[in-house]
Amino acid sequence: MKEFPKNYNFIESEKKWQKIWQEKQIYAYDENIAKDETFVVDTPPPTVSGQLHIGHVYSYTQTDFIVRFQRMMGKNIFYPMGFDDNGLPTERLVEKQRQVKAYNMGREELINICNEVVASEEEKFRSLFNQIALSVDWNLEYQTISPLSRKISQMSFLDLVKKGEVYRNNQPILWDPVDGTALAQADIEDKEKTSFMNYITFKTEANDEFTIATTRPELLPACVAVFYHPDDKRYQHLAGKFAVTPLFNVKVPLLADPLVQQDKGTGLVMCCTFGDQTDITWWKTHNLPLNTIITKKGTIDFPHEIGIDGLKIKEARAKIIDILKEQELFVKQEEITQTVKCAERSGAPLEVLTVPQWFVKTISHKDELLKRANELNWHPKNMKIRLDNWINAISWDWCISRQRYFGVPFPVWYSKRIGEEGKILYADISQLPVDPLKDLPIGYSKYEVEPDLDVMDTWATSSVSPQLSTWGISDEFAVNKDRHGKLFPMDLRPQAHEIIRTWAFYTILKAHLHQNTLPWKNIMVSGWCLAEDRSKMSKSKGNVLVPEKLLEQYGSDVIRYWSANSKLGADTAYSEDVMKNGKRLVNKLWNAAKFVSQHFDKLSDEDKKTNLIDVKEKITHEFDQWIINKLVELVNNATNELQNYEYANAMHLTEKFFWSVFCDNYLEISKTRAYDEENKNPSGQYSSVLTLYHVMQTLLKLFAPFMPHITEELYQILYSENSIHIKGNWINYGNLNYKIDAKQPERLLEILDHVRKFKAEKNLSIKAEVQLLEVSGIELSKELTSDLKNVTSAKEVKFKPTNDEIKVSILT
């Protein structure tokens, strides 16, 4: 055993061990070990455009608890770290940091700047993840924009093309006019906004007036029909007739459709191409003409004497209303609250435009995906309903093309050869990764093709995050077929609950389409980290906690302790009180270890090296045997909780045992025997010290997944020069159990509680001498009575046998 330092300096210790773990490759994956002995993690690649905050620490450490446990259980761990550095989020970061606009820059210039920025941001993440002791193997690091990732992402696309699961079509899509790109259904959020319902006068061909209500009068030039509900008796007389639009005098059909809400507005609604998804449905169902007036920039494209051409949406709306009023065609306006579909990132209200895009078939697979969700092991189980609800709500195929620059390009060109104009040309697998702006399809010159200018949705690459690590998509499309087969499907996907509808869903979809399987066996879903007042952290509120400051103040182990105190999947508020409890626990571990260590030289070197099971006969004292039984019970329960991903329960059980059973009671009761200054009870002393030795060692191992630095420091001082975190270093006591009457030691604790309470009430020191301790009830054994005398400082203990509950009288 090394000399025990006077104090614990967490800053020095944490830096020291982080360096040693890296140098000694404690967390390295061994590719030569069989698949069934390996635990494979699909680590969330953080979006490097995001601000580093305490939420990163919160969620990533919860994964690390499970990984460290699995490693100590003997598993070969595949625990990579990736960085999601491609796509629109990175472009927006660059625009903000460099005060530029992507559409004002050359494509190549923007890409170069993006690469510079992400390299800098990734280094910040690496530093933080090392500081909080994530036990990842950094040799497995990947970036979603790297050549290898681009190759695998393009393989995914080509595999889906070959399977007929991808198509390109010129159809209505959701468009963000601020970021200038198409979006998928999962990229939008519904926002409640104040708006106005405008009542406008229409006429029939016969000059009969009627009123429609709309929130978007600027779309009048795009009106292609007017609808009413077939059961609405007010308007059944309009069947087969035509309406004439105000201001523009365009004849449009009056049609019946069950999607009309009779109690909304007047029950008559105009269909424009396009205001919302209902317009798309009507356009398709009734084979209506396409009349597009909104541009990609969110302005009106409608040269007309009315003068709205080139105006922004809101400007055009105001002008149309003014003109309707002038011509006495405006009936009234009502303020309403409506749900508006907005872009999740820019926040802009979306438009529906008809622009050619790439799509992954999704709607046709909804039933299959619901079955996949059932096959998956959810931790916690109640998170599954979120995926079920999302799948049931899907109404669009997944649009995977984006009109941006910094992303994975489509391996696609369009032929300009005579006779095959517009033919889609795909790259050969041998060419990947390709940039169609620089590369050419086999057999074609640059004059014969037009490159696809779009890039893939960042989720199109993130959705194959398992495959980015396994280096393959399928048997046919793989960089390393053996590696892919060995690692896929994976064991665990950890992630936050708000991206179930995106990352979880898309990854399940891709694995299902590529290999007809789940991507992983288990999904572990974390909640949000909230501010102390339980509000969501945001820069605008000024309540975002910066991890670096907390690490300086408390250290990594304390922050990890706070994270471990949150139930899986629960939103948890940051708590100074919990942090202080964590600091107190670190100090108590140090002091408890320091206390027990002074006795370890009383043990033989052989017994120190021997497993508890093989020296169990040397633990002879009844109270020592009792705590060993309790310890075995703790190990079994904590192991079971960790195997079920309930790390918080495991932490709670271990901490409760450490404080209540070990520190408050066992140490106090057994320390007189451990000292045995008069050498009255050598066997009792040896039994006590051997018990202290193994209980402390076991507790360090139980705490190790949660608090890796303090446990490593103490373990190497007290027990071994090998890391506590090495593979196979978990505790296994098998069926170890001492045949004792557990009621006797527990009775001792109950009596001790009475004595402590008495002394506290009398303002006596806990060590104050007791002349006579008289106890009614069942008599304790000789061994336990001796312990009772020692811990209560009683000169004499008498028992009065009765069947009543314990009563204690004390004479001081």
From Swiss-Prot:
SUPFAM superfamilies: Anticodon-binding domain of a subclass of class I aminoacyl-tRNA synthetases, Nucleotidylyl transferase, ValRS/IleRS/LeuRS editing domain. Its EC number is 6.1.1.9. It is an enzyme of class 6 (ligase). One of its GO terms (cellular component) is cytosol. One of its GO terms (molecular function) is aminoacyl-tRNA deacylase activity. A motif ('KMSKS' region) lies at residues 536-540. It catalyses: tRNA(Val) + L-valine + ATP = L-valyl-tRNA(Val) + AMP + diphosphate. Its main location: cytoplasm. GO terms for biological process: valyl-tRNA aminoacylation. The keyword Aminoacyl-tRNA synthetase applies. Pfam families: Anticodon_1 (PF08264), tRNA-synt_1 (PF00133). This is Valine--tRNA ligase. It comes from Rickettsia bellii (strain OSU 85-389).
